[in-house]
Amino acid sequence: MSTVTEDSANGNRIAPENPVAAPTQPIQPPPEPMSPARAAIYMASSLLLFLTQGLGMNLLNANIYQLQGSLSATTSEIAWLSAAYIAPYASMSIALFKIRMQYGLRRFAELSIVCFVLASVLNIFVSDLHSATVVRFLSGMAAAPLSTLGFLYMLEAFPAARKLSVGLSLALMNTTLSAPIARIISPPLMDLGGWHALYTFEMGLALMALPVVYLLPLTPPPRANVIQKMDILSYLLLAIGFGCLAVFLTLGRLYWWFEVPWLGVLLAGSIAALTLMVVLELPRKMPLIDLRWVFSRENMHMAGILLLFRVVSSEQTTTAANFYMQLGLINDQTQTMYTIILLASIAGGLVCTVLMLTRYVETAHVLALVLIACGAFLDSQSTSLTRPEQMYLSQAMVAAGAAMFLPPVMSKGFATALAKGAPFLVNFLVIFLFTQSIGALVAQAALGTFVTLREKFHSNVLVEHILLTNPFVAQRVSQLSGSYGKVITDKSLLNAEGLQLLGQQVTREANVLAYNDAFLVISVASAIGLVLLLGHLTWRRFVPHTAAAPAVATPS
């Protein structure tokens, strides 16, 4: 097995500490700098690839309630589509990295986009929930390479000195755009044809991306024999572990954690598969994943930061979106707000890009946490009368903060992995995928469970005061039942209808209070993260010998 390779983004040779073999083909000379026009085309191609992959996932999440009628399914059953998509997606990039190194970048790119187009075409044959679940599983497998290609096309547009600063920052900004765009374009698509319009649009994007990959080549790294037989078994165990865990986290809150036995089976299967993978990997001299390096102190610190990002960024992607649905707001009523979120994400990404070119890189983290903490706190003051107009400022703050948070961490982690050698990028991918894919599901499941528990708590507190002996309660019941007075003459039935309507209002208010609690928790988590970050920066300033490596580094 060879561990001598080349950075796939810029063609620079990377030599780890203990190389064991030479690549199977000569090293390519560094590419000539691109003209501004050609670089702009590569950047636009990167955006297209990110949108193709991201909209394929987010269009479903944005229309989960509208699709129940199209597929004749309940909310819990529709959630299987998200679980089927994320199960293979969570681990696929790890295998694809080694496949790309062994069989060549060009072949990898062309085959990847063809597979995604075929997966998109399969949507034509979807007729019910079962066929949709199978197609979503295949789409999740086919979509994993597109995010990799999106990164590579963005990095290709910049010289080596700017790849891990400007290139990486813009690429990560592109990953945040598909969620608000999905909410913006969903209403006209659903009006055109429901489920069929959504998958037709997805297929159209895939067909647009197809000629891009064939006409715009990437700098090919040298191929090397990096796949061993044990790598296949280790990856299968990792895929099973991540896949079972993804399904467990996606569906656990909906079916409830302790109510159905198969959730426990999924969790046990995930733990068993990952444990067996660890047992197989630890004794290997050249493992698929260097677990000792992955669990080093520096990487655990980075993983903690990435997990914090997933928790605080879920304020917008999950908690706020569910809050709107709880208030009965549909995508048509939130289009303007998501347009503002989109613009704020772009602004935050561009500001972070500028900061990445200076020595004030850590300022991006500080600004991001301040914006998210303040935005989430403003959202925690919501009521049942709150509408999108009252949340424009807070959601724009959260969007800008989320776009600024990730690039400095990713740049530092990328540079650290490259300093150890290109094979360590696989280990870095494990950390990134676990914290972003599985971490996002953990954040969604934890916050969703928290909202459910707090709703029950607030309901019990509110119901304690619903007594007909209270004249205000009796008056409210009479007012609510008045609309039925012309069709129901029985006084007892009329009061029962009034109590039912009052109970619905109590449940609505309890849900609003529960979401306010969740927003407040996110705000407090962001504030705690900010305090820890400022303490860490102060420590580094006054104790120079403990300072970490520079946040932005480029391979030599």
Where are these regions (language model features)?
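Helix-loop-helix hairpins in multi-pass membrane proteins, especially solute transporters
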Residues: 93-233
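Extracytoplasmic
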Residues: 37-96, 131, 146-147, 317-321
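Central cavity-lining transmembrane alpha-helices of secondary-active solute carriers
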Residues: 82-98, 147-152, 339-352
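12-transmembrane solute porter fold
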Residues: 39-54, 61-62, 75, 286-456
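Interfacial helix-cap and linker-helix signal at transmembrane-aqueous boundaries
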Residues: 67-69, 99-100, 132, 185-194, ...
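Cytosolic juxtamembrane N-terminal segment immediately preceding the first transmembrane helix
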Residues: 1-55, 69
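Hydrophobic transmembrane-helix bundles of small-molecule transporters
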Residues: 187-305, 309-312, 316
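Hydrophobic transmembrane architecture of multi-pass small-molecule transporters
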Residues: 431-556
